[in-house]
Amino acid sequence: MRGGGNMQQMMKQMQKMQKKMAQEQEKLKEERVAGTAGGGMVTVTVTGHKEVVDVEIKEEAVDPEDIEMLQDLVLAATNEAMNKADELTQQRLGKHTQGLNIPGM
């Protein structure tokens, strides 16, 4: 049974890390990040779980003659917000997996 204590210690560390990561995931639900486009004419806000919670469109962004521009602005703001959510998740969870070679983390 050599090395059994080492394995037990490693399992305890993994359980501790799992618990911390679960807590961070819970916090991410509440965190908000925003993406903007068109100089702030469109703002999309998402949670750390990438759930869209708000879309703001300033009046000057609405041109009935150019709906495609508004669509592009909404798309760009959404993509920026999603990228920020990914970065936030990496910051929060990455500190717990640093130095570990876990696929997908």
Swiss-Prot record:
Any one GO CC term of the record: cytosol
GO-annotated molecular function: DNA binding
InterPro entries named among the record's database cross-references: YbaB-like_sf, YbaB/EbfC
Keyword DNA-binding: yes
Compositional bias of kind Low complexity: 7-16
Cell location: Cytoplasm, Nucleoid
Biased composition (Basic and acidic residues): 21-33
Residues that span the membrane, as ranges: none
Chain segments carrying region Disordered: 1-40
Keyword annotations: Cytoplasm, DNA-binding
Domain of life per record: Bacteria
UniProt cross-references to PANTHER family, sorted A to Z: NUCLEOID-ASSOCIATED PROTEIN YBAB
Family the entry assigns: Belongs to the YbaB/EbfC family.
Record text on subunit structure and interactions: Homodimer.
Function comment: Binds to DNA and alters its conformation. May be involved in regulation of gene expression, nucleoid organization and DNA protection.
Protein name stated in the entry: Nucleoid-associated protein SERP0115
Organism: Staphylococcus epidermidis (strain ATCC 35984 / DSM 28319 / BCRC 17069 / CCUG 31568 / BM 3577 / RP62A)
